[in-house]
C-alpha cells in the first residue's frame, strides 16, 4: 500500500506545534530529520536538541485529501504553512531494507562486527555478533570505531578489562573475544546493563566472565585495561576515579571527545599517564596511554 508523505521545513521552535497538529489530522508517523547536515555533538543534559533547520516528515494513508489536510493543518497552527512538499511513496519491507543497509564492519586486523542475520565474511577472524538499532552502540559511530580499533591493536591475553559506560557491552565483549580473561562493565542505565548481558550471551560469553554493575555497585578493583567511550565532560570530572581504576602499568583508552575538548581531557590525565598521540575519526578523537608507576 502506498503512503502520502508530507514534508515541512520548520525551526526548532515550531517543532512541537507542528508535530501535535500532524498527529491530530491523522498522521500515522512523524519523523524529524536534519535539513542541512548540521551535526549536534554534545547536547546539554535534559535537552532534546533539534537542528536549526529541520524537516518534519509525516506519513498519511494514501487516500487522504491533500487540500483538506493542508487547510486543517493551517487552521490548527494558526497561520500560513512553512515551506512544504507532498508526494506519494511506495510501500516496502522497511525491516528488510534496514537490514540490507547494515553490513559487517572490520576494525583493525582481526575484529569484525557482524549482524546476526549475515554470514561472517572471514569465519576464522574474531567475529562479534551484534545487531544495529540499539541505543547503546553498535560500531557505526566514530567513537565506538576508534575504541574497537584500539582494542584490536592491544595484547589482551590474560588481561582484566573495565568498560566504563558499557552501553551495549560492545567494547568489553570485543576485548573478551580478542583474548581478555575477564571484563567488567558499568553504566548508569539499567537497560544498558541488560543489553550488555544479552549481547554477551549471544556471543557465547558466560556471565562470570562479564559481570555488569550500576556505578554505585562497581567493585573497587583495578583493571589492566580501561576503556571509556562517554563524553568529554564526564571524562574530565571522573578523571580521579578512572585513574584509580587502572593499575600502574595498565592501559587507558578514552573517546567521545571533540577536537576542541582534547587539551582539557589530556590535561586531566597527563599527571598519571604517558599519553599516546591522539587518534581522530570524523571529528571525534581517542586519547590513550599507559599509567605510570606510583
From Swiss-Prot:
What gene makes this protein? prmA
General function of this protein: Methylates ribosomal protein L11.
Homology family: Belongs to the methyltransferase superfamily. PrmA family.
What is the protein name given in its UniProt record? Ribosomal protein L11 methyltransferase
* Biological processes, Gene Ontology terms: methylation
Q: Where's it found, cell-wise? A: Cytoplasm
- Tell me if Transferase is a UniProt keyword of this record: yes
Q: Which GO terms describe its molecular function?
A: protein-lysine N-methyltransferase activity
Q: Does the keyword Methyltransferase apply?
A: yes
Q: Which domain of life is it from?
A: Bacteria
Q: Which reactions is this enzyme annotated as catalysing?
A: L-lysyl-[protein] + 3 S-adenosyl-L-methionine = N(6),N(6),N(6)-trimethyl-L-lysyl-[protein] + 3 S-adenosyl-L-homocysteine + 3 H(+)
Pfam families from the UniProt entry = PrmA
What is the scientific name of the source organism?
Pseudomonas paraeruginosa (strain DSM 24068 / PA7)
- Any one annotated GO CC term: cytosol
Q: Which residues form a coiled coil?
A: none
State where S-adenosyl-L-methionine binds.
144, 165, 187, 229
Amino acid at each position: 500500500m502506498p503512503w502520502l508523505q508530507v514534508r515541512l521545513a520548520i525551526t526548532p521552535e515550531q517543532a512541537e506545534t507542528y508535530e501535535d497538529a500532524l498527529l491530530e489530522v491523522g498522521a500515522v508517523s512523524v519523523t524529524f530529520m536534519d535539513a542541512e547536515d548540521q551535526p549536534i555533538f554534545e547536547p546539554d543534559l535534559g535537552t532534546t536538541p533539534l537542528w536549526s533547520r529541520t524537516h518534519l516528515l509525516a506519513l498519511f494513508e494514501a487516500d487522504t485529501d491533500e487540500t483538506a489536510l493542508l487547510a486543517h493543518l493551517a487552521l490548527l497552527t494558526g497561520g500560513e504553512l512553512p515551506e512544504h512538499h507532498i508526494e506519494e511513496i511506495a510501500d516496502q519491507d522497511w525491516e528488510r531494507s534496514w537490514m540490507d543497509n547494515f553490513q559487517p564492519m572490520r576494525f583493525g586486523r582481526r575484529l569484525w562486527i557482524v549482524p546476526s542475520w549475515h554470514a561472517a565474511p572471514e569465519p576464522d577472524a574474531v567475529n562479534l555478533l551484534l545487531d544495529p538499532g540499539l541505543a547503546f552502540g553498535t560500531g557505526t559511530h566514530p567513537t565506538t570505531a576508534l575504541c574497537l580499533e584500539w582494542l584490536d591493536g592491544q595484547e589482551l591475553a590474560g588481561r582484566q578489562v573495565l568498560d566504563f559506560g558499557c552501553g551495549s557491552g560492545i567494547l568489553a565483549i570485543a576485548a573478551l573475544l580478542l583474548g581478555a580473561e575477564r571484563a567488567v562493565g558499568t553504566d548508569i542505565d539499567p537497560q544498558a546493563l541488560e543489553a550488555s548481558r544479552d549481547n554477551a550471551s549471544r556471543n557465547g560469553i558466560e556471565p562470570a566472565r562479564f559481570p555488569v554493575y550500576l556505578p554505585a555497585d562497581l567493585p573497587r578493583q583495578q583493571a589492566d585495561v580501561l576503556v571509556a567511550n562517554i563524553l568529554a565532560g564526564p571524562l574530565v570530572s571522573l578523571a580521579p576515579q578512572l585513574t584509580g581504576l587502572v593499575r600502574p602499568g595498565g592501559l587507558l583508552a578514552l573517546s567521545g571527545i571533540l577536537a576542541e575538548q582534547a587539551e582539557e581531557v589530556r590535561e586531566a590525565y597527563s599527571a598519571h599517564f604517558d599519553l599516546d598521540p591522539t587518534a581522530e575519526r570524523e571529528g571525534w578523537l581517542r586519547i590513550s596511554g599507559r599509567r605510570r608507576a606510583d
